[in-house]
From Swiss-Prot:
Belongs to the globin family. Keywords: Heme, Iron, Metal-binding, Oxygen transport, Transport. This is Globin-3. It comes from Mordacia mordax. Disulfide bonds: none annotated. GO terms for molecular function: heme binding; iron ion binding; oxidoreductase activity; oxygen binding; oxygen carrier activity. SUPFAM superfamilies: Globin-like. Pfam families: Globin. Gene3D superfamilies: Globins. Transmembrane segments: none annotated.
Length: 150
């Protein structure tokens, strides 16, 4: 299923959750490296998104991005937010609350264009479980919630 960022998707099934956890655990066990790789891939594929991060100004190459402590810090925040969602799959109210709070922060404090959530979700899904409908469903749920304040 392609990742969507509006409307609704069916709830995660027990089988979805099992697949998601298996794939996620493989990536998250090396979250420092994988988080940076994901964010660098996002910025190199979508350079306009980097404009929302003043601290990343002047980081023009993948190598520059990988070496930046600010990039590493933000990459870990992103992967930990996804990890929180993965760990909250059985508590959708908790997941919803946290992601809606994150949505509000990105609107009010950072004025981030919401289209980038879906792009980043695609990079994450391609890294964690390429082509896996269960993981794409989770990323759709995350995107829909991140768009809630827009």
């Amino acid at each position: 299923m392609p990742i969507v960022d509006s409307g609704s998707v069916s709830p995660l099934t027990a089988a979805d959750k099992t697949k998601i956890l298996a794939a996620w655990d493989l990536v998250y066990k090396n979250y420092e490296k994988n988080s940076v790789d994901i964010l660098v891939k996002f910025f190199t594929g979508t350079p306009a998104a980097q404009a929302f991060f003043p601290k990343f100004k002047g980081l023009t190459t993948a190598d520059d991005l990988k070496k930046s402590s600010d990039v590493r810090w933000h990459a870990e925040r992103i992967i930990n937010a996804v990890n929180d969602a993965v760990k909250s799959m059985d508590d959708t109210e908790k997941m919803s609350m946290k992601l809606k709070e994150l949505s509000n922060k990105h609107v009010k404090n950072f004025n981030v264009d919401r289209k980038y959530f879906k792009v980043l979700a695609g990079v994450i899904a391609d890294t964690v479980a390429p082509g896996d409908a269960s993981f794409e469903k989770l990323m759709s749920i995350i995107c829909i919630l991140l768009n809630s304040a827009y």
